[in-house]
Amino acid sequence: MDPISFKYIAIAFMAFGMAGAALGVASIFNALMNSIARNPSAIEDLQKAALIGAGLAEAMGLFSFILAILLMFT
């Protein structure tokens, strides 16, 4: 195979990193909604932890996207 085709295959596999980040954020907010339904008085602490976790999960997706763009144009 041509090395350029390997590059495009690697870019396609980086989409799995973005999909994993989306699933992670969905899982975090699903757990947040279940936790708020069980204990509404702890909403402030739960929201802080969920937003930090969602930010970290989304950062992994952004890193994967940036690496895919860099690989595509180099």
Swiss-Prot record:
Subcellular localization(s) per the UniProt record: Cell inner membrane
GO terms assigned for molecular function: lipid binding; proton-transporting ATP synthase activity, rotational mechanism
The keyword Cell membrane appears for this protein: yes
PROSITE patterns: ATPASE_C (PS00605)
GO cellular component: plasma membrane; proton-transporting ATP synthase complex; proton-transporting two-sector ATPase complex, proton-transporting domain
Transport as UniProt keyword: yes
Keywords tagged on the record: ATP synthesis, Cell inner membrane, Cell membrane, CF(0), Hydrogen ion transport, Ion transport, Lipid-binding, Membrane, Transmembrane, Transmembrane helix, Transport
Membrane disposition: Multi-pass membrane protein
Principal place of residence: membrane
Site feature location: Reversibly protonated during proton transport: 58
Transmembrane domains' residue ranges: 9-29, 51-71
Family as reported in the entry's similarity comment: Belongs to the ATPase C chain family.
Function: F(1)F(0) ATP synthase produces ATP from ADP in the presence of a proton or sodium gradient. F-type ATPases consist of two structural domains, F(1) containing the extramembraneous catalytic core and F(0) containing the membrane proton channel, linked together by a central stalk and a peripheral stalk. During catalysis, ATP synthesis in the catalytic domain of F(1) is coupled via a rotary mechanism of the central stalk subunits to proton translocation.
UniProt subunit comment: F-type ATPases have 2 components, F(1) - the catalytic core - and F(0) - the membrane proton channel. F(1) has five subunits: alpha(3), beta(3), gamma(1), delta(1), epsilon(1). F(0) has three main subunits: a(1), b(2) and c(10-14). The alpha and beta chains form an alternating ring which encloses part of the gamma chain. F(1) is attached to F(0) by a central stalk formed by the gamma and epsilon chains, while a peripheral stalk is formed by the delta and b chains.
Protein name: ATP synthase subunit c
Organism: Orientia tsutsugamushi (strain Boryong)
Lineage of source species: Bacteria, Pseudomonadati, Pseudomonadota, Alphaproteobacteria, Rickettsiales
